[in-house]
Amino acid sequence: MELNKYIDHTLLKADATSADIKKICDEAIKYDFKSVCVNSCYTSLVKKSLENSSALVCTVVGFPLGAMSTKSKAFEAKTAIEDGADEIDMVINIGKLKEKDYDYVEKDIQAVRDATKGKVLKVIIETCLLTDEEKKKACEISVKCGADFVKTSTGFSTGGAKVEDVKLMKDTVADKAMVKASGGIHSREEALAMIENGADRIGASSGIKIVEG
């Protein structure tokens, strides 16, 4: 198994500097990771840093709370793509999901989907804040909107990826979308457990540790 090709090499901390971002790009090239995942202000820097590699540019949108306006999310996604993003990881509006305003949640995702045509869209549902039924509903709405992936977590809330959530999400989306596990995955064993239970992609800041075992 080419574990490196499952890894979105990630740095989303508020205090990340341009030098830090360049460093993870160099690491992504060295280890041949699938992508580098960053906040949107660094999209163009990552694009430039990865121009001679196969690694993709992944940018987060509405991160980490998902509570910004739909127009703002769509604009951030559109701008990220203009700056060179190949993939967009957006956060759903969690509060609206929990109050069962599914129409809002759908329109929110759809607006970002419409702004990202031709690019990969991953929808972060923040599993640690949801019941199993809410997780299923979030996955169903994401699929309905044409998301390419559903993703467990931001890594900035009360918990990260769990094997049981990955399995639930995979069972829900079946072959209609892929699953990205992220948040708290620090070892090869943890990454393999996620993959064995349905994860198609791993988001981690510990990518080197994961592939080196």
Curated annotation (Swiss-Prot):
GO terms for cellular component: cytoplasm. It is an enzyme of class 4 (lyase). Pathway: Carbohydrate degradation; 2-deoxy-D-ribose 1-phosphate degradation; D-glyceraldehyde 3-phosphate and acetaldehyde from 2-deoxy-alpha-D-ribose 1-phosphate: step 2/2. GO terms for biological process: 2-deoxyribose 1-phosphate catabolic process; carbohydrate catabolic process; deoxyribonucleotide catabolic process. GO terms for molecular function: deoxyribose-phosphate aldolase activity. Its EC number is 4.1.2.4. The keyword Cytoplasm applies. Catalyzes a reversible aldol reaction between acetaldehyde and D-glyceraldehyde 3-phosphate to generate 2-deoxy-D-ribose 5-phosphate. PANTHER family: DEOXYRIBOSE-PHOSPHATE ALDOLASE (PTHR10889:SF1). Belongs to the DeoC/FbaB aldolase family. DeoC type 1 subfamily. This is Deoxyribose-phosphate aldolase.
